[in-house]
Amino acid sequence: AEAAAAPAPAAAPA
């Protein structure tokens, strides 16, 4: 859910 809200999925910490 939060990852979808982020502008770029790659920007999310893996």
Curated annotation (Swiss-Prot):
Origin: domain of life: Eukaryota
Extra information: On the 2D-gel the determined pI of this unknown protein is: 4.3, its MW is: 19.6 kDa.
Protein name: Unknown protein from spot 11 of 2D-PAGE of heart tissue
Organism of this sequence: Canis lupus familiaris
Native organism taxonomy: Eukaryota, Metazoa, Chordata, Craniata, Vertebrata
